């Protein structure tokens, strides 16, 4: 054997100090096996997360509607985010630009309450262009439907908040659908009111009463089916800050004195119903959806008070509401040309709450006057509201016996 071979053989033999005992070798081998198992387990968990997808399990009831879903197992798919174009609509929005006009509250932080209201305003989106999604619909159909819902609310002495919740549910639901047939509008409208009444009213009308006011057009089963469709489409987000909620807040903040009692109304009921009537008329026009509810309410308040009151009550500057104030001018002219609305007395409704009960007047005729004025303001011909085929609920004396 050569000297070189002897050196290589000696080098490959373990030195006495480097020799491992059998116990140490077993421990090292167990650690290696555990590490390998942990890595394999983590890979299996990641793979398992990617092995499921959502699939519709029921056929959609409406064209373009949202149906219930199930989670099913699928082959492994790698999830990547290579295309960021779909995130362009999600931009940071500064909600602190409007300081809180709320006074100190005994039951919470006024800044947090105000910020939560602004967040809701941004989350609950509405758009006047939703009729683009529905080729069979015309703007006056929405006006006729909402006018009918106003009348139903008065017949059953429902609160203004109930109507405005129903209006919000209807408008947001229509944004989630496509090509809704005009024959479905009454069902969607009365179901929206049914949902709103269960949220807002202490003694809400029964299901059969909502079916009754449609004069046989909608059955109880139809309303229940549509209720689930609407709730699913809205993702159960049913707590918007409505127009009438903003009006209550603004008038209350303006009326507060040195010792505020925020929980009890401090403002004039007469002032409230005058502005509420203007807002009732405005919301019938589909163009009102171009503005946030807060802006719309502040503009109405400005027409009946002053910009100083608006700044104090809402924290909004003139630049924020000027466009809406100008848009509202024809509505104000029509409202002020009619007899002033008066407080009504309702059975079983306390005097201090009567201004909160929704009332109805000949809003469609008033809206037609607004359209006539806008014809000259905008220099273009606007189609008037059609009075034909208006859905009319029964009179109070014609409600089903034993119902309320």
Curated annotation (Swiss-Prot):
According to PubMed:9858585, highest levels of expression in adult testis, thymus and brain. Lower levels in placenta, spleen and colon. Consistently elevated levels in tumor-derived cells compared to non-transformed proliferating cells. According to PubMed:9840927: low levels in thymus, prostate, brain, skeletal muscle, and kidney. Elevated levels in lung. According to PubMed:9840943 highly expressed in testis, placenta, thymus and brain. In a lesser extent in small intestine and colon. Keywords: Cell cycle, Cell division, Cyclin, Nucleus, Phosphoprotein. It is found in: Nucleus. SUPFAM superfamilies: Cyclin-like (SSF47954). The keyword Phosphoprotein applies. GO terms for molecular function: cyclin-dependent protein serine/threonine kinase regulator activity; protein kinase binding. Essential for the control of the cell cycle at the late G1 and early S phase. This is G1/S-specific cyclin-E2. It comes from Homo sapiens (Human).
